[in-house]
Regions:
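Penicillin-recognizing serine hydrolase domain
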Residues: 63-213
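Active-site-adjacent loops and short helices of periplasmic peptidoglycan-processing enzymes
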Residues: 1-100, 109-113
Length: 213
């Protein structure tokens, strides 16, 4: 949201530099990779590419510190009173958010057409260092088409475990789903399917327990 709110040109070229590579080693974006801001946003949302996310922050006016400040201001505007952001990627354990705050963020992010589209993009092939590289959406439910998902993001650090947040439409009702600290790699996705199935079986017709949208 901060990237899009900034109105910075989406076709501006950004370069993955040595600092990005040194800070985030698990990435297929090699040093020297050239991306547009739009491509970096797509890879960050779809494939959880941390170098892409960090590069977006580094190329924000004022750099990463200003970007993080903007993230925290945005959170405050949204009423996320139990959240704090420490870096653009979410990989630092100092990044914290409550489940309810994450629903607030989901509701706000859903208003951005590009975030909806990019976060639910199944896969993408890009030429990186003169070689085609295929990037997959980190949410297997998006790739399989098992659910009607309007927005989603996966995440993982040791302190938080496997996490998943998403907006999905079940029985023509938009639901905000938050799964934190899932035990296994696939359990968060299986839990989402279980919630969908349970909701569809509710007697007397489906109705939201708590309407958040």
């Amino acid at each position: 949201m901060v990237v899009l709110d900034s109105k910075l040109p989406l076709d501006e070229t950004l370069v993955i530099n040595a600092d990005d590579v040194r800070s985030y080693r698990t990435s297929r974006l090699a040093g020297g990779t050239v991306l547009t801001r739009e491509e970096a946003l797509l890879l960050a949302l779809m494939s959880s590419e941390n170098r892409a996310a960090y590069t977006l922050g580094r190329n924000y006016p004022g750099g990463v510190p200003a970007f993080v400040d903007a993230m925290n201001r945005k959170a405050k505007e949204l009423g996320m009173d139990h959240s704090h952001f420490a870096d653009p990627t979410g990989l630092l354990s100092e990044n914290v958010a409550s489940a309810e705050d994450l629903t607030r963020m989901l509701s706000a992010a859903y208003q951005y057409k590009m975030i909806r589209e990019f976060s639910t993009w199944p896969d993408l092939t890009m030429v990186i260092a003169k070689r085609p590289q295929k990037f997959l959406n980190t949410n297997r439910l998006v790739r399989s088409g098992d659910m009607n998902i309007g927005l989603q993001k996966t995440g993982f650090i040791n302190a938080a475990g496997k996490c998943l947040v998403m907006q999905a439409r079940v029985n023509n009702t938009p639901l905000l789903l938050v799964f934190l600290d899932s035990v296994g790699t696939q359990s968060r996705f299986a839990d989402a399917v279980r919630v969908r199935d349970w909701y569809e079986r509710m007697p007397g017709g489906a109705h939201p327990i708590r309407r958040l949208m």
